[in-house]
């Protein structure tokens, strides 16, 4: 960016002094509370990776990192990631010091399942009051939480209230029709006309006959190894509240509720039984309970449905993952370098409007890809420029964004689930094929790791100021330094320029205007008058230019303006 040109553009900044004032947060009422504001030079952060004063502090603010423990970092050499490995690598995620730029800068971690389980992924839970011994001890987990707290990192854990494993003691007891636990799960007796015991789900039987008690069938929406809970049972509901309290007492900040849209799946209910309304009521009950235990808690649900259905669940959960943002909205526009008629921003505004009508206090949770989806690095064919723009489009939108581990490196996958969950790439291998980083996990099959043979590791990307990793660091810093970006509401604003995707973010102390050029060519246009008084706080590169009353953004470039 030609910095001198901003002096010719009064509505960007009248002078370098005004630049510094806005960037240091002197125009933001909440910025003065941070002691780091006196030692950070925010003007540098506009065009390069530099320290900022990070203001996002609550569990419901900032940027989360979705982390599969098994694949992240191995502290004991058994090839499997563990809690001590995470602790050792925390400084990569956030070292707790605003004055450094070596860390990613995230403010929260979502740990994929940590409970004992017969499966590598952990979504069929044996014991809700313990940790997977593959990952370490409860003491190791508590130590990891303590180290996260020192760095200002909130931790939420995956919680499955929809089903358990068949090895869970609750399910074992439930197999006796006379045991009180029998009603904790969805059982049906042969001949009960209310249920279709021949029902198929995703290519398998929904109802599974108990080999010990012929004529009794239990529901397994995701397979016979995952028996479904019956949340109509009051004792089970009370037990789950005890589970939440147990983990809050350990120090977690909330939960990611797996399969939240399936707890009352219509396929497994008796004919005529209510589905969505009962599910929403359950989630409201559990979220209200969580808040009674920890008022600042942040929990959210996985509702992998269309936006209209998801909006219903927002009424109870308060926050849901925003499916479709990455694999449909962003990826499609970047594949074809076509912003349409500001399509992405308009679709977001429409989706978020549904949430607001359902729950005025909703918190959106955008993401590019997750552990169940092909990685965005592969979807966009490893195109670093497009991956940078994809990151900017969701990290700078409304809500609490979730980065899937390795996404900041451009990791790729196939369609098989195991390929989406392969080891984090800390360093390249030596001549003998062994990882140079001793904490590199090695549990995954070599055939599942082939997609990342050419993906650059953390060690390699940290040496390159233009790498995807370093760009993520910049984006996260601008997100967490500006209240409009981490707690503002999104408003689609059309510049009238073809190829430009743009929106405003507004909170009570600040406004921001976000612009991306999705086309293949540079685009010159005027910033809308309502945002013409704002100063630049982020530009993607030096080739952004201002000429008189117009701004020019190169292909796949991003500019963010902010001020009060």
Annotate each PLM feature:
Residues 40-48, 145-146, 153, 162-163, ...:
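Active-site-proximal helices and loops of the catalytic beta/alpha 8
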Residues 59, 287-293, 305, 314, ...:
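Loop/helix patches that line or flank the sugar-binding groove of alpha-linked glycan CAZymes
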Residues 15-26:
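Bacterial N-terminal signal peptides
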Residues 30, 34-241, 245, 249, ...:
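Acidic/aromatic-lined carbohydrate-recognition and catalytic surfaces
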Residues 106, 252, 260, 399-400:
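A structural motif
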Residues 547-564:
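C-terminal beta-strand-rich structural cap/linker in extracellular carbohydrate-active enzymes
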Residues 3-17:
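Bacterial N-terminal signal peptides that target proteins for export
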Residues 522-541:
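Beta-strand-rich binding/interaction modules
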């Amino acid at each position: 960016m030609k910095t001198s040109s901003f002096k010719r553009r009064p509505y960007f900044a009248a002078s370098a002094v005004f630049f510094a004032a806005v960037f240091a947060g002197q125009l933001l009422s909440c910025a003065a509370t941070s002691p780091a504001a006196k030692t950070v030079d925010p003007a540098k952060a506009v065009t390069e990776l530099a320290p900022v004063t990070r203001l996002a502090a609550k569990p419901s603010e900032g940027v989360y990192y979705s982390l599969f423990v098994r694949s992240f970092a191995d502290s004991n050499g058994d090839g499997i990631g563990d809690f001590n490995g995470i602790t050792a690598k925390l400084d990569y995620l956030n070292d707790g010091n605003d004055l450094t730029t070596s860390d990613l800068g995230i403010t929260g971690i979502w740990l994929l399942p940590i409970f004992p389980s017969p499966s590598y992924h952990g979504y069929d839970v044996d014991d809700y009051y313990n940790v997977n011994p593959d990952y370490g001890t409860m003491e190791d987990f508590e130590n990891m939480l303590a180290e996260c707290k020192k760095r200002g990192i909130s931790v939420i854990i995956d919680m499955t209230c929809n089903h358990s494993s068949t090895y869970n003691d609750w399910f074992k007891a439930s197999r006796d029709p006379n045991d009180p636990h029998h009603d904790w799960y969805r059982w049906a007796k042969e001949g009960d006309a209310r249920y279709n015991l021949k029902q198929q789900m995703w290519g398998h039987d929904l109802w599974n006959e108990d080999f010990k008690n012929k004529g009794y069938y239990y529901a397994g929406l995701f397979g016979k190894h995952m028996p479904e809970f019956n949340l109509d049972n009051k004792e089970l509901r009370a037990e789950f509240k005890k589970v939440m309290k147990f983990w809050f007492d350990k120090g977690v900040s909330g939960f990611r509720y797996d399969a939240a849209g399936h707890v009352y799946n219509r396929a497994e209910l008796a004919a005529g039984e209510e589905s969505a309304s009962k599910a929403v009521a359950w989630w409201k009950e559990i979220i209200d309970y969580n808040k009674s235990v920890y008022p600042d808690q942040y929990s959210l649900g996985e509702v992998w449905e269309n936006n209209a259905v998801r909006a219903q669940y927002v009424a109870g959960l308060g926050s849901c993952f925003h499916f479709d943002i990455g694999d449909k909205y962003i990826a499609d526009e970047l594949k074809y370098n076509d912003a349409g008629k500001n399509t992405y921003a308009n679709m977001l505004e429409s989706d978020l409007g549904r949430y607001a009508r359902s729950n005025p206090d909703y918190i959106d949770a955008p993401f590019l890809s997750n552990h169940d989806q092909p990685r965005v690095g592969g979807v966009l064919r490893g195109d670093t420029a497009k991956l940078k723009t994809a990151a900017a489009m969701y990290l700078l939108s409304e809500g609490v964004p979730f980065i899937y581990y390795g996404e900041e490196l451009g990791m790729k996958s196939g369609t098989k689930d195991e390929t989406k969950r392969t080891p984090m790439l800390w360093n390249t291998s030596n001549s003998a094929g062994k990882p140079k980083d001793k904490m590199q996990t090695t549990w995954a099959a070599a055939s599942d790791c082939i997609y990342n043979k050419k993906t650059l590791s953390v060690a390699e990307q940290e040496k390159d100021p233009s790498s995807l990793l370093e760009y993520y660091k910049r984006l996260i810093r601008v997100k967490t330094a500006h209240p409009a970006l981490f707690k503002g509401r999104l408003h689609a604003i059309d510049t009238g320029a073809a190829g430009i995707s743009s929106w405003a973010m507004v909170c009570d102390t600040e406004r921001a205007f976000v612009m991306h050029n999705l086309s293949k060519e540079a685009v010159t246009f005027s910033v809308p008058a309502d945002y013409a008084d704002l100063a630049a706080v982020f530009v993607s590169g030096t080739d952004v230019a201002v000429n008189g009353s117009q701004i020019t953004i190169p292909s796949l470039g991003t500019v963010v303006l902010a001020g009060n």
